[in-house]
Design a protein with these regions (language model features):
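Gly/charged, well-structured mid-domain segments that form the phosphate/adenylate-handling core
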Residues: 181-184, 198, 207, 474
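Structured, hydrophobic secondary-structure cores that serve as assembly/anchoring elements
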Residues: 1-115, 126-128, 157-160, 245-544
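Extended, beta-strand-rich, solvent-exposed assembly scaffolds of outer structural proteins
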Residues: 55-58, 110-191
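Charged, gly/pro-rich, cysteine-poor intrinsically disordered low-complexity regions
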Residues: 189-191, 196-210, 214-219, 442
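Short, solvent-exposed coil/turn linker segments
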Residues: 52, 170-171, 187, 225-237, ...
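Detector for intrinsically disordered, low-structure N-terminal pre-sequences
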Residues: 2, 90, 167, 171, ...
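Long, low-complexity, polar/charged, intrinsically disordered or flexibly structured peripheral segments
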Residues: 205-244
Length: 544
């Protein structure tokens, strides 16, 4: 663009830069898929972005305890944020068996809830539980009843949670009053709602001789042969419902996430689908072990059946059994960790994936994605240590480590730490370049960064000026990684190479609109084995 001149002197013209700055991609956005709160999830089957566990409680109802609906998802999200996580996507699922066809009626919004009916004079108070009651039973007490029976307090207890509503009154008039049962409780309580029975709320309350009992809608699952609500179809889909890991699914449409978790799920078909999905999305999948798997086989004279040792689950000795799928985009962590359940106050085993994902995020923030998320600095928070069956010594871990099983260990004076950084292909000689978690995650980070930052190249003239601009942009990005200590080598030329010229893009490529870019780099590998050699100097005199 020419400069319009009029007076003798100096004119300044700002020119657009031909260089394009590359913005690094995020590294620790986690995606969680699993069963969410059966009564308080706003929308099942939809990916929702959250930035705290408070956000999770808003959209998915928070923690719960149930022996029918698996509660690993909320526990994993809870541990993720406690251990350093900051951003996540969550897809909450409802067991398809609770659909009202061949199992219990659909639970929660638009369906049914467990109920408890308290009789009053001329009517009743019908309480609906907003929490599963098959594992923890809510307690509802009407106390401090005035002589007239028209004023009383309601105390609701569920595990460690207690709610008190004082000065509730009967009867309920035609116009809502601040002390009506439904006005005081509904929309405020996280544990129950209340409604009038078929005869209305009644006029007064007199304590009964026997306490009323809950009617649990999920109890029919036992009668129909379902001891658990789990089904692989909830994750993989069926003829009428697409799976979470299929193209154009709600999670597939999320532009970028880095970590994929299916907390507590060990079904081979679901794990295989999750790993394949992670590979397609350039993400890394953190796999949980079976909850009861011990570190080593239980020796005789233990009575059968005994839980399958973790190494036999990864590589079964029995012909025809499914092996844990191999993938450079995944890692297995073992064992389950003990942690206090905020719902019940009891110490229970929890799947390790949520803890580990938080450690990934914390390590990325403090050291970088190229640092192995393992070592004494990876102190796992909110756990009292591994379950007893997962406690091991160095020799026992050595056997597991060679089978790509990353262990969580408790060391005296340190606490519980991540003590392994191998991918699922580490034991395969054909995939040794992807043996270590940080090497694979650094590669995925570079791929995601370049994919997001090179869109400007599309439809540009495919010739030398474009090639120079591409090389300049990528080289600047790789140089920044080198200066942060992400790459091996004493000089930039030792650490990385970027080529985009006539040697990578031929005239034939140009003719069909292809530009080829070659980015080579030398990743840092973790010091997994530290060998100390000690020699004694012979012939020395005492005190020399």
């Amino acid at each position: 663009m020419s400069v319009s001149t009029s007076y003798p002197g100096i004119y300044i013209q700002e020119l657009p830069s031909s260089s394009h700055a590359i913005v690094p991609a995020p590294t620790s956005i986690a995606a969680f898929v699993g069963y969410s709160h059966p009564y308080q999830t706003a929308t099942f089957g939809k990916a929702v972005q959250i930035f705290s566990f408070t956000d999770y409680q808003t959209y998915f109802g928070g923690l719960f305890s149930s022996g029918i609906t698996d509660a690993s998802l909320p526990r994993a999200v809870y541990q993720f944020f406690l251990n350093g996580g900051s951003t996540a996507w969550v897809v909450g699922l409802q067991p398809g068996l609770f659909g009202g066809t061949d199992g219990p009626a659909r639970l929660g919004p638009g369906g049914v809830y467990p109920t408890l009916t308290i009789a009053t004079t001329g009517g009743s108070l019908v309480f609906s539980s907003l929490q599963p009651i098959d594992s923890v039973t809510p307690s509802i007490r009407l106390t401090n009843v005035r002589t007239s029976g028209t004023v009383f307090d309601v105390i609701v207890t569920y595990g460690t949670q207690i709610e008190t509503y004082r000065g509730i009154t009967l009867p309920v008039g035609t116009k809502p009053a601040p002390t009506d049962p439904n006005v005081m409780i509904n929309g405020i309580s996280k544990l129950v709602t209340v409604a009038a029975g078929s005869g209305g709320y009644g006029t007064s309350y007199t304590a009964p001789n026997t306490a009323p009992a809950w009617v649990d809608v999920t109890a029919t699952s036992q009668a129909t042969g379902y001891s658990t609500g789990y089904s692989a179809d909830d994750f993989l889909g069926n003829s009428s419902t697409p799976g979470i890991f299929e193209p154009n699914s709600t999670l597939d449409n999320v532009e970028i996430f880095n970590l994929l978790l299916i907390p507590g799920i060990t079904d081979n078909a679901v794990v295989s689908a999750a790993l394949a999905f992670a590979e397609r999305k350039r993400a890394f999948c953190i796999i949980d072990p079976p909850p009861q798997a011990p570190a080593v086989a239980v020796p005789p004279p233990a009575k059968p059946p005994q839980p399958q040792p973790i190494i036999d689950w990864v590589d079964p000795p029995t012909a025809g059994s499914y092996m844990l799928p191999e993938s450079q985009n995944g890692a297995l962590y073992f064992p389950y960790l003990l942690s206090t359940d905020p719902v019940t106050g009891n110490v229970i085993p929890m799947a390790p994936s949520g803890f580990v994902a938080g450690i990934y995020a914390a390590t990325d923030a403090s050291r970088g994605v190229w640092k192995a998320p393992a070592g004494l600095a990876t102190n796992v928070l909110n756990t009292t240590g591994p379950v007893s069956s997962g406690i091991m010594n160095d020799q026992q871990q050595g056997v597991l480590n060679l089978q790509s099983i990353n262990c969580l260990r408790a060391f005296s004076g340190v606490g519980t730490v991540v003590w392994g950084a191998r991918t699922l292909v580490a034991a395969n000689p054909a995939y040794q370049q992807w043996m270590y978690v940080p090497v694979r995650r650094l590669t995925l980070f570079i791929e995601q960064t370049l994919l997001a930052n090179l869109r400007w190249v599309v439809f540009e003239p495919n010739d030398e000026p474009l090639w120079v601009a591409i090389t300049s942009s990528i080289s600047a990005f790789m140089l920044s990684l080198f200066r942060q200590g992400a790459l091996q080598g004493s000089t930039p030329s030792d650490a990385f190479q970027v080529k985009c010229d006539s040697t990578t893009t031929s005239p034939a490529d140009q003719a069909i609109g292809i530009v080829n870019i070659v980015v080579a780099f030398a990743p840092l590998k973790p010091a997994e084995f530290v060998v100390v050699q000690i020699a004694q100097l012979a012939g020395q005199t005492a005190g020399a």
